[in-house]
C-alpha cells in the first residue's frame, strides 16, 4: 500500500514480533479476545509512537511540561501521523467541569448572551437599555410632523446648595424655563420656597417634530445638553396630551442600575459571574432537601416533612397547614408535583417570583421580611419569621445550647442546592439577560436534543444575526455532534464527574469533531460502551465523518455492527496473553473470507456464523423477589420494580433511561443499608420490600483496576499467593534458615531485594525524555535475594512460580498434590484467565480481565451466603468468545444460590437472561418508565421498546 502506516517487528507486551500495514484515512477496527494484544498494538504502539514523535518535535523547554511516552519496542514504524487517544475514562473530577464547558458549547453560549442578550427588568418586564441621542431623535421623528414637544431633564442639586441657588445658576447659564407639575413657567418668576423637586424639570428646548437636517441637528445638540445637565437622564414631553418618554445613558430601569452583559457575567468560574453564596459550585453545606423530605410522593399534610413529626415538632406542621392553606398553598399535593414557586413557599415562607410591588415589609423574628400585601401575620410568625422549613431550622440554631437541637441540625445537614442561585451557579443578575425570551440557566437545563430544536427555531433581528451568526453555527454544530453520538438526553449543566466512561468518551469524540482537525490519527477504546444498539448507527456515522475529514480512525471494538461497518479489520489472536499477540486477519472488513480454517480466528468464526452464543433451552423459574416501590430518583417516574432472586436479571434500555439510577443508586445502596453496611444515601424511593431475609450480602462488581500499584497481581487478589508463600516457608531449607512466609513476599522487608524494593526493575528519571525502566542489577529482575531463591519446591523457586501462567501453575501444583492452592487458582482458569502469569502486575490487565479476576474471587469464596451480585456492563472489553466464558461463570454463581442483576446493552447476554427489565422509552426526561419486564421472549413482543426490536432478531422471532 502506498498511503499506509507500516509497522515492523512490534514486540510490546505480548505482541509476537508482528509486522503489518494499516491504510491511512480509513475506519479501522482492531478486535480480538480480551488480553490478546489489541490495546498493546493500538495504544502502547501506535498512539505511543505518534504522540512521542509529535512531542519530540517540540523544544526541550516545552517537552518538560508534557507527558512523555516510552518508545515502543519495535524495529520501525513509518508513515504515522500525530496521534490522539480518546479513552473510556472519566478524564476530570473537577466539580466545576460540566458537559457544557468540556464541549465548549457553554463558552459560545456565554458569548451569545454577552453580544445579543437583552436585559429585562424583573420589576416591569421592560428591556433595560443605555440610550443615545439617536434613540431620542428616533423617538421624536416617530411622531407626526409639527407635533410640539419639550426637551427636559431632572433638576440636580449638589450637596450644600439650595434650590434657589441652583435655579439662579441655571438662569445665568442661559436656561429660561422649567416645568413644574406639568406647567411650564419662567425661572425668574418661580417661587421655589414650597416647591417639590421630584415634580420639577429643567426645560432645555422647545421644538416641533421635523425631518429637516437643521431640526434634527438642533434636537441632537439639545439632547446632549439635557443628558449632561440631567446627570445622564432626560425626557421628551409631547403636546398636547403630555405623553412622557424617559431616556438614560446609564444602564438602568425602574430605579435599578443593572450590570451590562459581558461574557464573564455568565461564567461561574469567574468572580464576576459566580454566585457569591456558593462561589459557582451550585451547592453548599446546609440543610439537605433529601434528608428533610425523603419521600417526595407524600404531601405536607401526609408528613412529607420528616423534621415536623413527633409530639413537639408537629406543631410546626399544624401551624403551616392552618395559615398557609388559607393563603392558597396546596397542602394535599405530593411534594414532587409542587412547582418551584410552591417549593420556595414551603422552604422559605413566601412564593418566589412575586412582583416587589405586591409585597410589604414586616418585622418578623427580629428581621425585616418582605411579605405578600394581603397576608395576615400570625403570632407564631412574629416570633419565628414566616412559617417554613428554613424558619424551623433557624429556631433550632437559636437554641443550639440544647443538645437535642444540635443533634437535630446534624441529622439533616448535608450538601444542598444553593438557596441564592437555586443551583444555577451564577449571580441573579445573569438571569435578567434573555435571548429569545430565555435565560442562559434555562438553556443549560434543557436536554441537548430539546436545546438543539430551540436553537434551530431561534429568530434574531438582521443586526443581531450579523453579530451572532458565527456563534450560532458553532453552537448548533456541537449540539448536533452530541446528538450524533447518542447523548441527546444529557443537559449542559451535568457535572463531568458524574458521567460514565462511555459517555465521557463520546463527549470527547464530539469535541474532536467540533475541532475539525485533519490528517491526524484518532485511536478510540470501545466508543460503543453504554450505547444501546439503537444508537450504534449514529456512532458509526460520526466515526465516518471523522474519517471523511481526512483522519485515520482506529477503533478497538467488539461490537458486531461497528466491525461490519469498518473499512478495514485487524484481528489479533488466536487466544489471549502469551497465546495471543499474532495477526490472525488484516484486510477489508467486507467481504470477509469464508475459506479460513475454523478455529484460527474466533472473530471470523463468529462473524461468519461458524460459532454462536446459544440461547438457553429454558429459563429458570422464580418465586422469591426484592421489590423497589416508588423509585423517583433523577428521571425515574415513581416506578415499582421486582428483581427476582436466584436467577439472572438484565436491566436494559437506551442510554440515559435510568438503568444505573435504578440499580446502582437505589437497589445497591438500599440493600447495603438494609444489611446495616455503610453506603451512600439511596436514590429517592418509597420502600424496599419482598424476601429481604433471603439476601445475606450484596456486591457491586465493576471493571475498575483490582490494584493500581505495580505490586498488585491477580494471585494476591484471590488469596492464592498466601498459600504458596506458606508452602515455601514449610520447606526443609526454609525451616533450617528460619524463613517465615513473610520472607517470600516482595512487598515486605526480609526476603525481597532491597535495591529495587521487590519491583525487579529500577526507574531512572530523565528530564526531557521518557523515564528509563531498567532490570535491577542486584537481583537481575528476580525480585528476591539470592538465598531466598535457593529454597525450592518441586525443583522450582519462588521466582519460577511467579513466572508460570495460571494453566501451568494448576498443572504443577496438581502434580505435587497441593489441592488447596489448585482450588484457589482454578476459578481464574474457569473465567478464561489461564493465560496470565501469576506475577503479572494488575496495572497491565484490561478492564474485562480486571472484572473476571473479581468474578474468580467470588467463585472461589468458601462462604455460600446468598449474595446479590450487581454488574454494570460486564461485557465491556469482551469478545464474543469471552462472553461465552462470562456466561458460564454467571451460571456457576447462580448454581451456588446467588442472584445476578446486570445492567447491559449486549444482546447476546440479554437473550441468555432469565428475566429482563426494560426502561425507557427514551433517555433523560423522556425516559424513566418501566416499559416491560419478563422472560426475553415476552419482552421481545413489546411494541414501545427499542430493546425488543433487537432482541427479536437475536431470538430469531421474525
Where are these regions (language model features)?
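Conserved phosphate-binding elements of NTP-dependent enzyme cores
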Residues: 1-958
Amino acid at each position: 500500500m502506498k498511503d499506509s502506516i507500516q509497522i515492523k517487528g512490534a514486540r510490546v507486551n505480548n505482541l509476537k514480533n508482528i509486522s503489518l500495514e494499516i491504510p491511512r484515512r480509513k475506519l479501522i477496527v482492531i478486535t480480538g479476545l480480551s488480553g490478546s494484544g489489541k490495546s498493546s498494538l493500538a495504544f502502547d504502539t501506535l498512539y505511543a509512537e505518534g504522540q512521542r514523535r509529535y512531542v519530540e518535535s517540540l523544544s526541550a523547554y516545552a517537552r518538560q511540561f508534557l507527558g512523555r511516552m516510552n518508545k515502543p519496542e519495535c524495529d520501525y514504524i513509518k508513515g504515522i501521523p500525530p496521534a490522539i487517544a480518546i479513552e473510556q475514562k472519566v478524564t476530570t473530577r473537577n466539580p466545576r467541569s460540566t458537559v457544557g464547558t468540556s464541549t465548549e458549547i457553554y463558552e459560545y453560549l456565554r458569548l451569545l448572551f454577552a453580544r445579543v442578550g437583552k436585559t429585562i427588568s424583573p420589576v416591569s418586564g421592560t428591556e433595560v437599555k443605555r440610550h443615545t441621542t439617536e434613540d431620542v431623535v428616533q423617538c421624536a421623528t416617530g411622531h407626526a410632523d409639527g407635533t410640539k414637544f419639550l426637551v427636559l431633564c431632572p433638576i440636580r442639586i449638589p450637596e450644600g446648595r439650595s434650590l434657589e441657588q441652583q435655579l439662579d445658576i441655571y438662569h445665568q447659564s442661559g436656561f429660561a424655563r422649567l416645568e413644574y407639575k406639568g406647567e411650564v413657567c419662567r425661572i425668574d418668576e418661580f417661587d421655589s420656597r414650597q416647591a417639590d423637586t421630584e415634580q420639577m424639570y429643567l426645560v432645555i428646548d422647545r421644538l416641533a417634530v421635523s425631518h429637516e437636517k437643521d431640526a434634527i441637528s438642533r434636537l441632537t445638540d439639545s439632547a446632549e445638553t439635557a443628558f449632561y445637565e440631567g446627570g445622564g437622564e432626560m425626557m421628551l414631553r409631547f403636546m398636547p396630551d403630555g405623553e412622557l418618554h424617559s431616556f438614560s445613558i446609564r444602564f438602568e430601569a425602574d430605579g435599578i442600575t443593572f450590570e451590562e452583559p459581558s461574557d464573564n457575567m455568565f461564567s461561574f468560574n469567574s468572580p464576576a459571574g459566580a454566585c457569591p453564596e456558593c462561589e459557582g459550585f451550585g451547592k453548599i453545606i446546609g440543610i439537605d432537601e433529601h434528608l428533610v423530605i425523603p419521600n417526595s410522593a407524600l404531601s405536607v399534610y401526609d408528613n412529607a416533612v420528616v423534621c415536623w413529626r413527633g409530639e413537639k415538632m408537629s406543631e410546626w406542621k399544624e401551624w403551616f397547614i392552618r395559615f398557609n392553606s388559607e393563603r392558597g398553598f396546596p397542602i394535599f399535593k405530593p411534594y414532587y408535583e409542587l412547582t418551584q414557586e410552591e417549593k420556595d413557599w414551603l422552604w422559605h415562607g413566601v412564593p418566589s417570583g412575586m412582583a416587589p410591588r405586591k409585597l410589604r415589609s414586616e418585622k418578623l423574628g427580629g428581621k425585616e421580611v418582605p411579605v405578600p400585601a394581603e397576608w395576615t401575620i400570625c403570632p407564631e410568625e412574629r416570633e419565628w419569621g414566616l412559617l417554613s422549613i428554613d424558619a424551623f431550622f433557624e429556631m433550632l440554631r437559636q437554641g443550639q445550647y440544647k443538645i437535642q437541637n444540635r443533634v437535630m441540625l446534624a441529622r439533616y445537614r448535608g450538601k444542598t442546592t444553593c438557596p441564592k442561585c437555586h443551583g444555577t451557579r451564577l449571580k441573579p443578575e445573569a438571569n435578567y439577560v434573555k435571548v429569545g425570551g430565555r435565560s442562559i440557566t434555562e438553556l443549560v437545563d434543557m436536554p441537548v436534543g430539546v436545546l438543539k430544536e430551540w436553537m434551530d427555531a431561534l429568530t434574531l433581528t438582521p443586526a443581531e444575526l450579523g453579530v451572532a451568526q458565527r456563534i450560532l453555527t458553532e453552537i448548533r454544530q456541537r449540539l448536533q455532534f452530541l446528538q450524533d453520538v447518542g447523548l441527546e438526553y444529557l443537559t449542559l449543566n451535568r457535572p463531568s464527574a458524574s458521567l460514565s466512561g462511555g459517555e465521557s468518551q463520546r463527549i470527547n469524540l464530539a469535541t474532536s469533531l467540533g475541532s475539525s482537525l485533519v490528517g491526524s490519527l484518532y485511536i478510540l477504546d470501545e466508543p460503543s460502551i453504554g450505547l444501546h444498539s439503537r444508537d450504534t448507527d449514529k456512532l458509526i456515522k460520526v466515526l465516518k465523518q471523522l474519517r471523511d475529514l481526512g483522519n485515520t480512525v482506529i477503533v478497538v471494538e467488539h461490537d458486531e455492527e461497528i466491525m461490519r461497518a469498518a473499512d478495514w479489520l485487524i484481528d489479533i489472536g488466536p487466544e489471549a496473553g502469551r497465546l495471543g499477540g499474532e495477526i490472525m486477519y488484516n484486510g477489508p472488513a467486507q467481504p470477509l473470507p469464508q475459506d479460513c480454517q475454523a478455529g484460527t480466528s474466533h472473530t471470523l468464526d463468529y462473524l461468519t456464523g461458524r460459532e454462536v452464543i446459544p440461547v438457553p433451552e429454558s429459563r429458570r423459574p422464580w418465586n422469591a423477589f426484592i421489590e423497589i416501590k416508588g423509585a423517583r430518583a433523577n428521571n425515574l417516574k415513581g416506578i415499582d420494580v421486582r428483581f427476582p432472586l436466584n436467577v439472572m436479571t438484565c436491566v436494559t434500555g437506551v442510554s440515559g433511561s435510568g438503568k444505573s439510577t435504578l440499580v446502582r443508586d437505589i437497589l445497591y445502596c438500599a440493600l447495603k443499608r438494609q444489611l446495616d453496611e455503610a453506603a451512600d444515601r439511596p436514590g429517592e424511593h418509597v420502600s424496599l420490600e419482598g424476601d429481604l431475609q433471603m439476601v445475606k450480602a450484596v456486591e457491586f462488581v465493576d471493571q475498575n483496576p483490582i490494584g493500581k500499584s505495580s505490586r498488585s497481581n491477580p494471585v494476591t487478589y484471590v488469596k492464592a499467593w498466601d498459600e504458596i508463600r506458606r508452602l515455601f516457608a514449610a520447606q526443609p531449607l526454609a525451616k533450617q534458615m528460619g524463613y517465615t512466609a513473610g520472607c517470600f513476599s516482595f512487598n515486605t522487608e526480609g526476603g525481597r531485594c532491597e535495591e529495587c524494593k521487590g519491583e525487579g526493575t529500577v526507574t531512572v528519571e530523565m528530564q526531557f525524555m521518557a523515564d528509563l525502566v531498567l532490570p535491577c542489577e542486584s537481583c537481575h529482575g528476580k525480585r528476591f535475594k539470592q538465598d531466598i531463591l535457593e529454597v525450592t519446591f518441586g525443583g522450582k523457586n519462588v521466582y519460577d512460580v511467579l513466572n508460570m501462567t495460571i494453566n501451568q501453575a494448576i498443572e504443577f501444583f496438581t502434580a505435587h498434590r497441593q489441592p488447596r492452592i489448585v482450588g484457589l487458582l482454578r476459578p481464574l482458569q474457569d473465567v478464561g484467565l489461564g493465560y496470565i502469569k501469576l506475577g503479572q502486575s494488575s496495572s497491565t490487565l484490561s478492564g474485562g480481565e480486571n472484572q473476571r479476576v473479581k468474578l474468580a474471587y467470588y467463585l472461589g469464596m468458601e462462604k455460600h451466603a446468598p449474595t446479590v451480585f450487581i454488574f454494570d456492563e460486564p461485557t465491556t472489553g469482551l469478545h464474543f468468545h469471552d462472553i461465552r466464558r462470562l456466561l458460564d461463570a454467571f451460571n456457576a454463581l447462580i448454581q451456588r444460590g446467588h442472584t445476578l442483576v446486570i445492567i447491559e446493552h449486549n444482546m447476546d447476554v440479554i437473550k441468555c437472561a432469565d428475566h429482563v427489565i426494560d426502561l425507557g422509552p427514551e433517555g433523560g426526561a423522556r425516559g424513566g418508565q418501566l416499559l416491560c419486564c419478563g422472560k426475553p421472549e415476552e419482552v421481545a413482543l413489546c411494541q414501545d421498546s427499542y430493546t425488543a426490536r433487537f432482541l427479536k432478531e437475536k431470538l430469531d422471532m421474525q
